[in-house]
């Protein structure tokens, strides 16, 4: 019975019935007799009404939950749409930024080319490759700074994407303002750079030369100090060694004097004098030790300074080598740019000539068209006069006048046909020239491609040529080493043969350690074997190559 209240109370009035049953169980059974049937019916009706009310409340609650869920789904869809809208706006802003960056770079390149031309015209005598390299470095740094600014703008836009839709217009306005501001700043910087770059480069080159000279002077001075300190240290060490030897001698003498106790007073006086000399020598040694320690400390300091200066020299050498390579690359780039500029100028001159020709032909065409229009007007007037004459003097017209008019009409038609032919020819010429202009643009693009391919092939050939030269140098070096080794082998063989020939008569005088039974049959075999024997250790070897190797090892 205790489990019944946990069941759903809104269905079929089970909750109230369970309460009633619990109450009836707790009370005595006679209480049932107190309820009349009418009261029981009323209670049942009340329970049914309560059950219906609970069902309606549950339905309303479920409907409200459904409505809330639908509102949440609509809100989520709106959020997704807003997010997609913001993302599209961000992408569009990014594309605009990239386009502006490309335009900015193109404008900068045009400005740089114009500035280089102006500076080349103004400073042809004083312009050097180093200055051009520094200019390019400063431009690269400026472009890097602009790139960093653009990246910062993009990050700001990414942060602003998470803000509400009301701020989108503000973001776009700010972005456009920043792009315009960067473009203006770039233009201002480019105009200022043209005026200040020469002075800056001169001052920088002078400062660098002064710094290098001062560093070289300090290095030379420190090296001189180091040499002096090392010489002084060697001298002090020698003096210390001499004093130590003298001290050891004096100590030996004093020990001898102490052992021989039965010596005279003169010897005692000499021993006292020796003791005083020993003390003075000890003092000198202490002073020398102090000087040595000071010299050691100075040496350590000088060595540290030398290491630092060597590191500085290495870094400067690396910087110089990198600058030299950059200079070479930039000189090559400048050379190629000048070549391309000359080619572009020649192409532009050709295009201008073609344009002038087309302009002349257009003027001719317009003049011919005017003449044609005039002739048409004259023809129409003549036709009108003919028609009028035919109408007015149909019967009185003379044959001569008619023939003259017919001749004029024929001449006008012939002139019109000739003019029409000329106009057709001019149209064909104009079409051909337009095709030539299109082919000129295609040929220009092909020329640029061929130029880049030619430069790439040229660089590859230069690399191959350098590698060939290096290999040739290595081959010559190896051939020289081989020749030297062969000469050494021959000389060593000659020396060995000489030694072997010098020792041969000694061996003839030496007694033979041969068994008696062998006799003259084993002698040629021994001679053949002794041909490939070592002259130093008399080791028998099978062939000449192993003999040479063994002789070299044995001599060493």
From Swiss-Prot:
Compositional bias annotation for Polar residues: 253-265
Motif LIR, residue range(s) on this chain: 168-173
Subcellular localization: Cytoplasm; Cytoplasm, Perinuclear region; Golgi apparatus; Golgi apparatus, trans-Golgi network
ZnF CCHC NOA-type: positions: 526-556
Protein's UniProt keywords contain Zinc: yes
Tissue-wise expression: Expressed in erythrocytes, skeletal muscle, heart, spleen and brain. Weakly expressed in lung and liver (at protein level).
Gene3D superfamilies reported in the protein's UniProt record: L1 transposable element, trimerization domain, Nemo cc2-lz domain - 1d5 darpin complex
Major place of residence: cytoplasm
Job description of the protein: Probably part of the TNF-alpha signaling pathway that can shift the equilibrium toward induction of cell death. May act by regulating membrane trafficking and cellular morphogenesis. May act as autophagy receptor that interacts directly with both the cargo to become degraded and an autophagy modifier of the MAP1 LC3 family.
Domain remark from Swiss-Prot or TrEMBL: The LIR (LC3-interacting region) motif mediates the interaction with ATG8 family proteins. Ubiquitin-binding motif (UBAN) is essential for its inhibitory function, subcellular localization and interaction with TBK1.
Known partners and oligomeric status: Binds to linear ubiquitin chains. Interacts with LC3 family members.
Name of this chain's protein: Optineurin
Organism: Gallus gallus (Chicken)
Lineage: Eukaryota, Metazoa, Chordata, Craniata, Vertebrata
Name of encoding gene: OPTN
């Amino acid at each position: 019975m205790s489990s019944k209240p946990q069941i759903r109370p809104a269905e079929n009035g089970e909750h109230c019935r369970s309460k009633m049953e619990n109450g009836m169980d707790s009370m005595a059974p006679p209480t049932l007799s107190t309820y009349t049937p009418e009261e029981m019916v009323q209670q049942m009706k009340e329970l049914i009404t309560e059950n219906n009310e609970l069902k309606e409340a549950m339905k309303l609650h479920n409907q409200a939950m459904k409505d809330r869920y639908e509102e949440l789904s609509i809100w989520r869809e709106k959020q997704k749409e807003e997010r997609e809208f913001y993302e599209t706006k961000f992408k569009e802003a990014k594309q605009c930024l990239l386009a502006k960056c490309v335009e900015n770079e193109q404008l900068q390149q045009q400005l740089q080319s114009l500035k280089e031309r102006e500076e080349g015209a103004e400073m042809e005598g004083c312009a050097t490759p180093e200055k051009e390299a520094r200019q390019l470095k400063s431009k690269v740094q400026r472009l890097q700074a602009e790139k960093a600014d653009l990246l910062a703008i993009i990050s700001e836009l990414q942060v602003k994407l998470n803000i509400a839709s009301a701020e989108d217009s503000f973001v776009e306005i700010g972005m456009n303002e920043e792009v315009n501001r960067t473009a203006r700043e770039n233009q201002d910087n480019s105009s200022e750079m043209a005026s200040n770059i020469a002075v800056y480069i001169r001052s920088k080159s002078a400062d660098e030369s002064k710094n290098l000279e001062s560093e070289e002077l300090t290095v030379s001075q420190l090296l001189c100090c180091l040499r002096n300190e090392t010489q002084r240290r060697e001298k002090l060490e020698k003096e210390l060694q001499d004093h130590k030897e003298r001290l050891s001698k004096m100590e030996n003498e004093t020990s001898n004097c102490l052992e021989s106790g039965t010596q005279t007073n003169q010897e005692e006086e000499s021993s006292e004098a020796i003791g005083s000399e020993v003390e003075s020598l000890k003092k000198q040694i202490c002073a020398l030790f102090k000087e040595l320690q000071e010299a050691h400390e100075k040496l350590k300091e000088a060595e540290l300074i030398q290491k630092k200066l060597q590191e500085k020299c290495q870094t400067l050498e690396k910087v110089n080598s990198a600058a030299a390579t950059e200079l070479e690359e930039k000189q090559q780039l400048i050379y190629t740019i000048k070549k391309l500029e000359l080619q572009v100028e020649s192409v532009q001159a050709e295009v201008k000539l073609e344009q002038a020709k087309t302009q002349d032909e257009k003027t001719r065409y317009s003049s011919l068209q005017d003449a044609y229009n005039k002739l048409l007007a004259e023809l129409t007037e003549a036709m009108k006069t003919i028609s009028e004459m035919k109408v007015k003097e149909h019967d009185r017209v003379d044959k001569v006048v008619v023939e003259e008019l017919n001749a004029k009409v024929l001449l006008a038609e012939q002139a019109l046909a000739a003019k029409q032919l000329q106009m057709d020819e001019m149209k064909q010429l104009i079409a051909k020239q337009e095709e030539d202009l299109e082919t000129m643009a295609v040929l220009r693009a092909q020329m640029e491609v061929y130029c880049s391919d030619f430069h790439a092939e040229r660089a590859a050939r230069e690399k191959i040529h350098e590698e060939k030269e290096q290999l040739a140098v290595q081959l010559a070096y190896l051939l020289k080493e081989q020749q030297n080794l062969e000469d050494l082998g021959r000389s060593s063989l000659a020396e060995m043969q000489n030694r072997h020939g010098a020792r041969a008569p000694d061996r003839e005088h030496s007694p033979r350690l041969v068994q008696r039974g062998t006799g003259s049959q084993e002698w040629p075999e021994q001679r053949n074997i002794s041909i490939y024997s070592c002259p130093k250790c008399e080791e028998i070897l099978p062939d000449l190559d192993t003999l040479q190797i063994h002789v070299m090892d044995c001599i060493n």
